[in-house]
Amino acid sequence: MGKKSLVKLTRKTNPRIVSLILTLKERANGDSAPIWKDIAKRLEAPSRNYAAVNISKINRHTAEDDVLLIPGKVLGAGLLDHPVTIAALTFSDSAFEKITEAGGKCLSLEEIMEANPKGSGIRIFR
């Protein structure tokens, strides 16, 4: 790991994010999956730059059974009328309810890495 990456990691105070970034980078190199390196880079940025995506935007831009990865938080504004699988750093309570009511799944980033190590078929959503 380069010196610049270590400096970025030492600025992070959340131990879950630090370990997640390290795991993402290991997976990117080990599984030859550049999607995990991209997500690690986005999570190294300041948290004010993390994605905050509403359910209404997810509903407009996805089809049934899509798999999304959101490097940030999913918010509950809007309605979801089809099932989607969403992996995100965090979910608001209302977003979690709306996704599960529509028949979708809410996963953590760690869970999606285990389920799909190559990252194929995953859309990064911002």
Curated annotation (Swiss-Prot):
Record family assignment: Belongs to the eukaryotic ribosomal protein eL18 family.
GO terms for biological process, alphabetical: translation
Listed name of the protein: Large ribosomal subunit protein eL18
InterPro entries: Ribosomal_eL18, Ribosomal_eL18/eL18-A/B/_CS, Ribosomal_eL18_arc, Ribosomal_uL15/eL18, Ribosomal_uL15/eL18_sf, Ribosomal_uL15_CS
Lineage of the species this protein comes from: Archaea, Methanobacteriati, Methanobacteriota, Stenosarchaea group, Methanomicrobia
Superkingdom of the organism of origin: Archaea
Position of the signal peptide: none
One Gene Ontology term, aspect cellular component: cytosolic large ribosomal subunit
Keyword Metal-binding: no
NCBIfam families associated with the record: PRK04005.1 (NF003079)
Organism of derivation: Methanosarcina acetivorans (strain ATCC 35395 / DSM 2834 / JCM 12185 / C2A)
Any Pfam family the entry gives: Ribosomal_L18
A GO term, aspect molecular function: RNA binding
Alphabetical UniProt keywords: Ribonucleoprotein, Ribosomal protein
